[in-house]
Amino acid sequence: MNKPIEITFRFFDEEHRARFWKSEYANNGNLYVGVTTWDKDFKCWMPWGDLTVNLPGMKCEPNEAFLDTNNCAPEIIRILKDKGYIKDTGITRPSGWCIYPLVEFSEEFLNGLFEKEDEDEEYNN
């Protein structure tokens, strides 16, 4: 893994530091990206939410995923787009009441993600 991708964003008038981790969805192997934020009280990275969503019947390329625009803070998505970490493919898929965009993640972003197997000590430094 390269240097971890870290951003700062505002949510409900509070500033948060965020890092990202990757795994895969069990049913289809699609890329999962989660968001963690630095907890000032516990002084460690804690799960915050999902950047991606798994849509039924969809198989994505290894560097692609559908963004969870229903639950992820819009500022996180905006920052990642502005930094060139995600690129809109122009493809969308509906699920429930939402329409989710398919994005392509940059190699730099993917190389800066922690994996679920990474040691906590390495991650929390």
Please tell me what each predicted stretch does:
Residues 4, 11, 17-38, 42-50:
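Catalytic phosphate/metal-binding cores of nucleic-acid and nucleotide-processing enzymes, i.e., regions
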Residues 4-6, 100:
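Short, acidic/polar N-cap/turn motifs at the starts of alpha helices
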Residues 10-11, 75:
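Alpha-helical interaction segments
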Residues 26, 59-61, 92, 111:
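A generic structural micro-environment signature
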Residues 34-84:
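Acidic, aromatic-enriched beta-alpha/helix-loop junctions
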Residues 69-120:
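Short, compact, well-ordered microdomains
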Residues 123-125:
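Non-Sec secretion/translocation targeting segments of pathogen effectors
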